[in-house]
Amino acid sequence: MKCLWCGEEVERAEPILSFLLGANRKCICVYCEHPFMELRQHPTCLECGRLMTKVEVCPDCQKWHQVKEAVLLKNTALYAYDEAGRKFMELFKFVGDTRVMTVVIKELRQELLKYQKRGFVLCPLPSSKASLRKREFETIPTLLEQCHVPAVSLLEHIGSGKKQSEKTRQERLQLKQPFKVKENVGVPKKVLLVDDVYTTGATIHLAAKALTEIGVEEVESLTLFR
């Protein structure tokens, strides 16, 4: 079997090891198991998790302070959205190769459990109907399922038009609400929104606004990349 990341041959694991690590573990060779820059080892923005030269609030977040829709308390990102991050998103989200999830599951699960211990209900950010028709699977719920952590689907996507990945930065910043809270759902006190990439922050801020409007008191977010 060839490594999904580098294309080199992957040594076959012993049967008991394959069972313990999961069937997909050996799709990635030992040299490619940790391909990303971990942001926790570097100075980042206090609010969005962006890579910085020193720990402070970045210019983008300072602008969000002036926007009434900005009710998100904080975003935590695991990895920098660099070449390796873009490669992961291409394989996972656009090619649809879910086996590549193995390079993020361990760290993602650890971070999710920390939020659960703090009383946060995990809520995946839903994909648009157009994206679902193309991919045929929900990326974030699929990740959460593999992490074996409970999550609640509180939101549905009601937006139309271009996918986020196809929009310009200016288009993403045009704040038109693409989410609504599902009917007959309980109102948690604290919600953690989970998404793949934080770019301008517009999508997550609007999701947070939809939740606070029904009475959620605290909304934070966790993304794979920033």
Please state what every model-predicted region is:
Residues 1-226:
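Glycine-rich phosphate/pyrophosphate-handling loop used in enzymes and phosphotransfer proteins
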